[in-house]
Curated annotation (Swiss-Prot):
It comes from Xanthomonas euvesicatoria pv. vesicatoria (strain 85-10) (Xanthomonas campestris pv. vesicatoria). Its main location: cytoplasm. This is Uracil-DNA glycosylase. Its EC number is 3.2.2.27. InterPro entries: UDG_fam1 (IPR002043), Ura-DNA_Glyclase_AS (IPR018085), Uracil-DNA_glycosylase-like (IPR005122), Uracil-DNA_glycosylase-like_sf (IPR036895). The gene is ung.
Length: 241
């Protein structure tokens, strides 16, 4: 998909279901676009080996919950392939601070000292951005270049081949992308985006985290532990950092 493509391998369970999409002409055009931007000196985030990190962290059969984001953070060292997440040591972005505030109000879990959400992903929370790359300082720079078709296909495949998932759709963009989800097969929870611009309009107070766990328990599944270990106890071996 990118310069260094040989080092990027889609996780096997995902490759079996959505890997063919990466061979389509529009994805080859996206690959060419990424190479051109890098050749022009653009800083593309996240680093190549982390572009598909959400799939590596949460294999297809292990998905319980899907959180849809828009595109990666565009600051130096922020994006590492999981939506809303940043690597340990990077300041927690404002939207994630509001997510933590809601978790604390909903479940009584104290805010962690970092923004690294890999422990959620390893429990079955697919942290998926609609667009998987961005350029430094240019939010949305890679929108409408081909990623959306691929991630639409991912959502549609989960919708058709899995049952009983929880989709957390925050903001109009995620809700539009989630229109294909069959609400007779899956639990869909909607709220405004956790951005400081909109969180007060209904994200804060949505109680999506307890509602997610209630649904999982009803299906006989283990709930998500939304608490995060302190930064000093994190396992960062799979970040590529």
């Amino acid at each position: 998909m990118t310069e260094g493509e040989g080092r990027i391998q889609l996780e096997p369970s995902w490759k079996a279901r959505v890997g063919d999409w990466l061979l389509r002409p529009q994805m080859q055009e996206l690959s060419a676009f990424l190479r051109q931007r890098k050749a022009a000196g653009a800083r593309v985030f996240p680093p190549g080996p982390q572009i598909f990190a959400a799939f590596d962290a949460t294999p297809f059969e292990q998905v319980k919950v899907v959180i849809l984001g828009q595109d990666p953070y565009h600051g130096e060292g922020q994006a590492h392939g999981l939506c809303f997440s940043v690597l340990p040591g990077v300041p927690v972005p404002p939207s994630l601070l509001n997510i933590y505030k809601e978790i604390q109000d909903d479940l009584g879990i104290a805010r962690p000292d970092h923004g690294y959400l890999m422990p959620w992903a390893r429990q079955g929370v697919l942290l998926l951005n609609a667009v998987l790359t961005v350029e430094q300082g240019r939010a949305g720079a890679h929108q409408n270049k081909g990623w959306e078709g691929f991630t639409d296909h991912v959502v549609d495949t989960l919708n058709r081949e899995r049952e009983g998932l929880v989709f957390l759709l925050w903001g109009s963009y995620a809700q539009s992308k989630g229109k294909v989800i069959d609400q007779a097969r899956h639990r869909v929870l909607k709220a405004p985006h956790p951005s400081p611009l909109s969180a007060h309009r209904g994200f804060l107070g949505c109680r999506h985290f307890s509602k997610t766990n209630d649904h999982l328990r009803r299906r006989g599944l283990s709930p998500i532990d939304w608490s995060l270990p302190p930064r000093s106890a994190l396992d960062t071996t799979s970040t590529g950092a």
